[in-house]
Amino acid sequence: MSLTIPSPIAATTPSAASMTAGEPKTYQVRTFGCQMNVHDSERMAGLLEEAGYVPADGEVADVVVFNTCAVRENADNKLYGNLGQLRQVKEANPGMQIAVGGCLAQKDRETIVKKAPWVDAVFGTHNVGALPALLNRARHNNEAQLEILESLDVFPSTLPTKRDSVYAGWVSISVGCNNTCTFCIVPSLRGKEKDRRPGEILAEIQALVDDGAVEVTLLGQNVNSYGVEFGDRQAFSKLLRACGEIEGLERVRFTSPHPAAFTDDVIDAMAETHNAMPQLHMPLQSGSDKVLKDMRRSYRSSKFLGILDKVRDRIPHAAITTDIIVGFPGETEEDFQATLDVVEKSRFASAFTFQYSKRPGTPAADLPEQLPKAVVQERYERLTALQDRIAAEENAKQLGRKVEVLVTAQSGRKAGETHRLSGRSKDQRLVHFSVPAGAEAPRPGDFVTVTITEAAAFHLVADPAGADDYLLRRSRAGDAWDRSQADSCGVPAAGAASGKAGVSLGMPSLPTRRA
């Protein structure tokens, strides 16, 4: 589907200083939603840079691209709120262009241009590669361009990618999903599952490692169904084991699996592959078997708890995280109590908790017994209070433990106020740590081994008593970070873990306390 829609605002001529001939246009990509969207945004940035655009330094860019989410209602509100704010900016900057892509664009299509006629281009999840051409066409024709494909045009992995992190990277192993969860609109927007061949995936991982990356996260809507297209039920566990053979790749993670298809061979591969991290994100959604049936989740709470038992038997210190929806249509107090019971038994390190949001086009939107907002809010608060307590108790078990932390790039006021650096442990816990006086500071991508001295619900703190309690391991990734700073004319302080922050997970932020 390709439409050209007249847009009076798009018809302005490029006269801003930044659009002067010979001067490169600037861009900004704003991402809403999941990890898949974060990775897609890296591709959008890569496409724009290949077309000659450069990242914007300030707030105003020649091109602003929104990569949207359609999972919850507030995603719509967030997009249109941002578009409204940009209207006056665009009027004050002739030649500026705005593009909207992602899941909401795939779903709403013409609605976006009707609600925000100052948008220049709308594209979907299946034709990310069309972005530069749509912008050029909109500029040339002085009309908004809308192009939505109903199936995948080119597998996204073939597109250029601008990675926001030199030490860690996302690698898609599949796109789309064959499940039919009643609350989820993603399969209708991203299509049926399509799997990449193992050789292509491993080649991309090797290229990342060659560029300095030490950590990779394998991405898919349902990673453990990987291989369905070429008939290999153990393809994902084989892929994990193959990652263990890549020299220089120190950490491998994946997200997200589905409990219904999570098999013992994957657990064995996690336990037996040296660089597979002791961390698992396993979406629960509900602890009520009745609600799980209404959600069409294809497993029950006993199976879910059985998976956790098997994982912890093979990987005793594994940190397990989850997703939970509160207030699904028809959820009773008894159903909700079943969720609380499963959460108590599961001992999650953290949980992404969501209030059910009615999404037109999903089967759940037509279910009877949609719950009042006040009931959903009250249950949500009880669930988060329980999970916060459990997270604090689980983190308290880390006190006195030595952990290896992959240092991340620092940004924001808090990093300057506390004089601590931050990173992720092998089990993905957030660790804030200080560098002893006289010790060498790490770079993003380096590793430090420290002892946990404080614990809170959402982070750990390590304040070494002296240099003997702090071990720095400089890495290829740290070297790559130094090169990236030199290439971008950055001038970091010697040894300081500062600079541009890495890619956000694109997931709801957990509240944090000051370290």
From Swiss-Prot:
SUPFAM superfamilies: Radical SAM enzymes (SSF102114). Residues 25-140 form the MTTase N-terminal domain. [4Fe-4S] cluster 1 binds at residues 34, 69, 103. The keyword Phosphoprotein does not apply. Its EC number is 2.8.4.3. Residues 490-506 have a biased composition (Low complexity). [4Fe-4S] cluster 2 binds at residues 177, 181, 184. GO terms for molecular function: 4 iron, 4 sulfur cluster binding; metal ion binding; N6-isopentenyladenosine methylthiotransferase activity. Binds 2 [4Fe-4S] clusters. One cluster is coordinated with 3 cysteines and an exchangeable S-adenosyl-L-methionine. It is found in: Cytoplasm. Its cofactor is [4Fe-4S] cluster. PROSITE patterns: MTTASE_N, MTTASE_RADICAL, RADICAL_SAM, TRAM. HAMAP family: tRNA_metthiotr_MiaB (MF_01864). This is tRNA-2-methylthio-N(6)-dimethylallyladenosine synthase. The lineage of its organism: Bacteria, Bacillati, Actinomycetota, Actinomycetes, Micrococcales. The gene is miaB.
